[in-house]
Design a protein with these regions (language model features):
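N-terminal hydrophobic membrane-entry segments
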Residues: 1-212
Length: 212
């Protein structure tokens, strides 16, 4: 009754792929590609993870599986939500649009920054990512939903960092156009809202800020 569990070839591009079946027989073979890891959840609670490679799912060699055994089946089936998460960098994600209006700390007027460019990112905490994703973009085997969610948090992050920079430097928001290199440097250092979901920004390219 063993099962072969792996990410299907036609879904290799997805940042997160959730295995459709939660009932997993003992001795099933799990294959994790070199650019991803596999996370096990039960009722939305994280239980453990497996690195790249081929794994035989049995409790002797993977102790956390003990928490997933279904006693009602004579103990030969695990109940688990299995997520495959990309751990390699994801490059050249384009972004563009308006931030919410912000009050200029010098002029005391509301201005609306517009930004565009592209960023590269990597998931450094897959558990946080799946927990956040579970609440926001889950179940859709669709990268667009996942990427839109990441972009929303990217914009929130830029807004937070802009606010911090203007407060610290005493500069007007209208000076932001000349501060894009500094701003992208800070985002690479620490992007607040993205850090909450285990994402690190590696680079921002062609970063442009203007005002509508």
């Amino acid at each position: 009754r063993e099962m072969m569990i792996a990410r299907p070839d036609n879904l290799k591009h997805l940042i997160v792929y959730k295995h459709p079946d939660q009932n997993v027989p003992f001795w099933s073979q799990l294959t994790v590609d070199s650019d991803e890891c596999a996370l096990f959840f039960k009722d939305g609670v994280y239980q453990g993870w497996l690195p790249a490679g081929r794994h035989t799912l049995q409790t002797q060699n993977i102790p956390f599986l003990n928490n997933l055994v279904n006693k009602f089946t004579g103990g030969d089936v695990f109940i688990a939500e299995i997520y495959f998460v990309k751990t390699q960098p994801i490059r050249s994600i384009p972004f563009g649009g308006k931030l919410e209006s912000m009050e200029d700390p010098i002029l005391f007027e509301f201005v609306t920054p517009r930004l565009h460019g592209e960023f590269s990112m990597v998931i450094i905490d897959p558990v946080r990512f799946v927990i956040g994703y579970h609440g926001q973009a889950a179940g859709s085997n669709d990268n667009d939903v996942t990427v839109d969610w990441i972009k929303r948090l990217f914009f929130m992050s830029v807004k937070t960092v802009i606010g911090q920079m203007c407060a610290q430097t005493g500069r007007s928001l209208l000076n932001l156009g000349g501060m894009s290199a500094e701003l992208s440097g800070r985002m690479v250092q620490s992007a607040p809202n993205l850090a909450d979901i285990g994402v690190k920004i590696l680079q921002i390219a062609d970063f442009n800020i203007n005002f509508s």
